[in-house]
Amino acid sequence: MPTISQLVRKGRKTVASKSTAPALKECPQKRGVCTVVKTTTPKKPNSALRKIARVRLTNGYEVTAYIPGVGHNLQEHSVVLIRGGRVKDLPGVRYHIVRGALDSAGVANRMQGRSKYGAKKPKQKK
């Protein structure tokens, strides 16, 4: 606990908060090109084959991004849009690919939570 005179002399240091998505450089999204598209296994106690892509961004950064939803059409050289948001059970995956933007197609036959997966509203039958 500092004294009043110590505070007058030095003041208090403000602690700068670290960014959770540093490669975005304060932008909401960034464009990038897939260099590798593969599957990986999550940490214990979970078990699955999670789809991920290594993406080279327009600012030169290379990041690992998660491909959400069931099925995807991404391959090497696909142009994708990246947003922040980590995947808790995949170490080092701190970004998500935006479905339905650029080369990434929306999830087919998705009825609920469509806006998060780039799925169009289905046609109504009369």
Swiss-Prot record:
User: Which superkingdom does the taxonomy of this entry point to?
Assistant: Bacteria
Among the Pfam families in the record, one is Ribosom_S12_S23
What is the purpose of this protein? With S4 and S5 plays an important role in translational accuracy. Interacts with and stabilizes bases of the 16S rRNA that are involved in tRNA selection in the A site and with the mRNA backbone. Located at the interface of the 30S and 50S subunits, it traverses the body of the 30S subunit contacting proteins on the other side and probably holding the rRNA structure together. The combined cluster of proteins S8, S12 and S17 appears to hold together the shoulder and platform of the 30S subunit.
Subunit arrangement? Part of the 30S ribosomal subunit. Contacts proteins S8 and S17. May interact with IF1 in the 30S initiation complex.
Disordered, as annotated region: 1-23
Similarity comment:
Belongs to the universal ribosomal protein uS12 family.
Q: Sites of the modification 3-methylthioaspartic acid?
A: 89
What InterPro entries does its record include?
Answer: NA-bd_OB-fold, Ribosomal_uS12, Ribosomal_uS12_bac
Which CDD domains does its entry note?
Ribosomal_S12 (cd03368)
Per UniProt, the keywords (alphabetical) are: Methylation, Ribonucleoprotein, Ribosomal protein, RNA-binding, rRNA-binding, tRNA-binding
Sorted alphabetically, the Gene Ontology cellular component annotations on this record are: small ribosomal subunit
**Biological processes, Gene Ontology terms:** translation
What this protein is called in its record is Small ribosomal subunit protein uS12
Origin organism is Clostridium perfringens (strain 13 / Type A)
- GO-annotated molecular function: rRNA binding; structural constituent of ribosome; tRNA binding
